[in-house]
Curated annotation (Swiss-Prot):
Record lineage: Bacteria, Pseudomonadati, Pseudomonadota, Betaproteobacteria, Burkholderiales
A GO cellular component entry from the record: cytoplasm
Annotated pathway: Protein modification; protein lipoylation via endogenous pathway; protein N(6)-(lipoyl)lysine from octanoyl-[acyl-carrier-protein]: step 1/2
Name this polypeptide is given: Octanoyltransferase
Annotated region described as Disordered, given as residue ranges: 137-174
């Protein structure tokens, strides 16, 4: 499966969204898969599950309704945004595995810079430990209310196993208190073809995240590589993420 990587630079969100839709609508079985890598001026985007009450105080930052999955997120300068435009039928895997592969590419990108990324069941995206983002400490799922009030698995940091210097852990009343979100994911699949994608925070002004409930979670902390002590340029992060996505999305 060949994949063309296109570096778009800094581009407005809405025309990029419209271009993704057009690309997907017009593509045929002969259309090569493509990976668009870009950066957006400040914008909030709402997913299909988004609720207006999660947009707390947008101010002068526009809010764009989209057809991707998920809830509200923020895009802005200093964030690498990657849009894989993939024919899953050609790729030979289904949506669940597609999401897993995107997350794995982000985890491997973070690992390249010495950071340990974590998945959180029921909360798509990638998270890091705020107390030690370079630690390999495990996370254990624990049933907690989801943003919609249903049960879901959210993380509790595990101390060492017996014999490793510690005891067991219990449910945390604030399961995200020790975690920060460093990458957000939201996709759309139309006629087995994907668009939208993933955003990795590199060196941003993080203040706009405080004006929303990111991904529908009130108080969820958002971090970037700079905040956790990793000095890397946008282009360096974009190049590594592009390479990892190209590799992990291959059949």
């Amino acid at each position: 499966m060949n994949m063309e990587i296109r570096h778009l630079g800094r581009v407005d969100y809405l025309p990029t969204y419209e271009a993704m839709q057009a690309f997907t609508l017009e593509r045929t079985a002969a259309t090569p898969n493509s990976l668009w890598i870009c950066e957006h001026p400040p914008v909030y985007t709402q997913g299909l599950a988004g609720k207006i009450e999660h947009v707390l105080n947008p101010g002068d930052i526009p809010v764009v309704q989209t057809n991707r999955g998920g809830q509200v997120t923020y895009h802005g300068p200093g964030q690498v945004v990657a849009y894989p435009l993939i024919d899953l039928k050609q790729a030979g895997y289904y949506v669940k595995e597609y999401v897993y592969r995107i997350e794995e590419a982000v985890i491997r990108t973070l690992s390249h810079f010495g950071v340990t990324g974590h998945r959180v069941p029921g909360a798509p995206g990638i998270y890091v430990r705020l107390d030690d983002p370079f630690s390999h400490a495990r996370l254990r799922p624990s049933p907690q209310p989801s943003p919609k009030g249903r049960g879901s698995s959210t993380p509790v940091l595990l101390p060492p196993l017996p014999g490793e210097g510690g005891g067991g852990g219990g449910p945390d009343p604030d399961p995200f208190h020790s975690l920060g979100k460093i990458a957000a994911l939201g996709i759309k699949v139309s006629r087995h073809c994907t668009y939208h994608g993933v955003a990795l925070n590199v060196a941003m002004d993080l203040e706009p995240f405080s004006r929303i409930n990111p991904c529908g979670y009130a108080g969820l902390k958002t971090v970037d590589l700079r905040t956790i002590g990793v000095s890397v340029t946008w282009q360096e992060a974009a190049d590594v993420l592009g390479q990892k996505l190209s590799s992990y999305l291959a059949p």
